[in-house]
């Protein structure tokens, strides 16, 4: 039910409305798409082909493209950018998109379309061209107007009124370096359509509440309500409180990386703006603690539920706790109650603040993993750990695996648990033992050959953190997860690509979400990492 709401909204953002198209526009549109010039796109594609070892093949293909310095490509100007803009509406059939094609020679382009594509073109006295398309297509005709060196193309003639066109010089005035970009302005949704969408959300919410009543399991019912209301709240925020969405693709040959950026710009002083600002100010002891040198993997999450979500979260936690106690064997009920009492304050806080890191392998090929989780009332959590140990020792008879309160490091108490990990873990970590460090506000764990990593990390302090992040060394990942190549083969290919200095800082795959004035998501990969993966795939087809 909730998913279906996104279908008309997505269609709305892409195709638009003829009615709303009648409003004069001079500089911006509700939806804007920009592509770099054909020459630039071919240059970026050449770089990408080089990353995957196919540059020679690609250049052979490019040589077959008939680009003329004066006539362009079949009359299209290959030196200037391409654009598309439109409006927002639920009336998909009346799409108000306008395509901007740069033209080097209009007659050459018209001749190509008529001779090669078989399109019939009629020029009218008002400057509009009617392009008749083959039958049985999605539309019978297109309409075009040539001005300022660009051919404006639309499905409806009314969209090409000369007074309402966005001048190409205004549309392409800013060059941010993106290969492709999409701008969506939800604040330009027409009032009538906004009311329709909000009414659909209210209707869906009522339907969710009715469906929730049919769930006999309390935990399932609470989870159903929380998930449904979360999606509806996000949808409502997009309609009411988001000003602009920017999606941009960057391909940077000089800095050797590719990235996809999404920026959400809120309405000033809106609840969403305040939430974004709060996310931008968050610090994390867990994130600071896992900041170690030589990491091949590092990630974190750090956010708190909004006030309107916390009540539903509490209901879900209470339902899960009640169900867990109901299903536990009678002989374990007292112990499980004590365990849940220690976990409950952290869960009720409705804060997700955790981080993890993994160092590069040592000479024996073993990794060390370090993780940290923010907790509430850590002393109660320590009591829960003791109860878990009692259950473990009672059920297994092993009274030597767990060693509590081994040492104190600052505010932390160290514990060691032997033989807790599966036998296969020893291949990668060199051990099956787990180290724990507990304090009033943090739970830290470490496993691997570098026992000093945990002790040294405990002296780190809190630091500003992103909402979500994941940094992965692609070479490090290949050493760990590639089943078709030995570590020696991986190292040889890494040396081939990066030289003796190694891949450090040049093979990263990164995902980061940050708050602040806007909410920004960036997914990027360094060129060296792509070259390495391509070479590894070629060596092990």
Residue ranges and their predicted role:
Residues 1-5:
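Positively charged n-region of N-terminal signal peptides that target proteins for export
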Residues 6-16:
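Bacterial N-terminal signal peptides
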Residues 17-21:
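Sec/Tat signal peptide C-region and signal peptidase I cleavage site
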Residues 22-138, 173-244, 259, 263-365, ...:
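Structural boundary/hinge residues at secondary-structure and domain interfaces
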Residues 71-76, 103-146, 380-434, 467-497:
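Short Gly/Thr-rich strand-loop-strand
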Residues 102-107, 156-160, 375-379, 448-451:
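Helix N-cap motif at beta-to-alpha junctions
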Residues 132-211, 428-508:
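A conserved glycine-rich beta-strand in the N-terminal activation segment of trypsin-fold
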Residues 366-374, 442:
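Ordered core of a single globular domain
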């Amino acid at each position: 039910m909730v998913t279906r709401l996104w279908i008309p909204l997505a269609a709305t953002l892409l195709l638009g409305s003829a009615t709303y198209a009648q409003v004069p526009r001079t500089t911006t549109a509700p939806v804007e798409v920009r592509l770099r010039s054909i020459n630039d796109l071919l240059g970026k594609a050449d770089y990408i082909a080089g990353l995957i070892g196919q540059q020679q093949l690609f250049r052979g293909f490019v040589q077959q493209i008939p680009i003329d310095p004066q006539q362009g490509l079949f009359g299209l100007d290959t030196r200037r950018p391409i654009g598309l803009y439109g409006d927002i509406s639920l009336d998909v059939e009346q799409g108000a998109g306008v395509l901007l094609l740069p033209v080097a020679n209009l007659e050459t382009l018209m001749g190509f379309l008529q001779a090669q594509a078989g399109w019939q073109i009629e020029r009218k006295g008002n400057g509009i061209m009617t392009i008749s398309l083959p039958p049985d297509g999605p539309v019978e005709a297109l309409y075009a107007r040539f001005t300022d060196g660009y051919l404006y193309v639309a499905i409806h003639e009314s969209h090409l009124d000369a007074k309402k066109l966005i001048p190409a010089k205004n549309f392409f005035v800013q060059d941010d370096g993106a290969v492709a970009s999409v701008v969506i302005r939800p604040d330009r949704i027409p009032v009538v359509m906004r009311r329709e969408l909000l009414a659909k959300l209210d209707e869906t919410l009522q339907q969710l509440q009715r469906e929730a009543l049919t769930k006999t399991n309390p935990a399932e019912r609470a989870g159903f309500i929380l998930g449904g209301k979360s999606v509806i709240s996000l949808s409502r925020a997009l309609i009411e409180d988001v000003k602009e969405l920017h999606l941009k693709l960057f391909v940077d040959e000089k800095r050797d990386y590719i990235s996809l950026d999404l920026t959400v710009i809120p309405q000033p002083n809106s609840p969403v703006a305040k939430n974004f600002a709060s996310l931008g100010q968050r610090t994390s002891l867990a994130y600071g603690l896992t900041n170690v040198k030589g990491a091949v993997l590092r990630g974190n999450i750090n956010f708190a539920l909004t006030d309107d979500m916390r009540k539903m979260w509490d209901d879900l936690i209470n339902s899960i706790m009640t169900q867990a106690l109901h299903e536990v064997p009678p002989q374990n009920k007292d112990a499980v109650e004590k365990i849940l009492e220690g976990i409950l304050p952290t869960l009720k806080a409705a804060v997700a603040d955790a981080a993890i890191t993994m160092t590069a392998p040592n000479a024996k090929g073993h990794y060390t993993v370090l993780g940290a989780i923010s907790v509430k009332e850590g002393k109660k959590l320590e009591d829960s750990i003791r109860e878990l140990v009692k259950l473990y020792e009672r059920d297994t008879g092993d009274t030597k695996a767990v060693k509590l309160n081994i040492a104190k490091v600052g505010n932390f108490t160290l514990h060691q648990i032997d033989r807790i990990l599966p036998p296969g873990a020893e291949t990668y970590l060199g051990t099956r033992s787990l180290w724990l460090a507990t304090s009033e506000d943090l739970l830290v764990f470490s496993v691997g050959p570098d026992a000093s990593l945990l002790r040294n990390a405990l002296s780190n302090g809190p630091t500003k953190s992103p909402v979500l992040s994941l940094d992965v060394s692609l070479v490090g990942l290949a050493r760990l997860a590639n089943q078709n190549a030995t570590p020696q083969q991986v190292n040889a290919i890494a040396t081939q690509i990066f030289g003796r200095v190694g891949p450090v800082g040049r093979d990263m795959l990164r995902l980061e979400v940050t708050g602040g004035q806007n909410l920004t998501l960036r997914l990027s990969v360094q060129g060296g990492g792509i070259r390495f993966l391509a070479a590894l795939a070629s060596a092990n087809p």
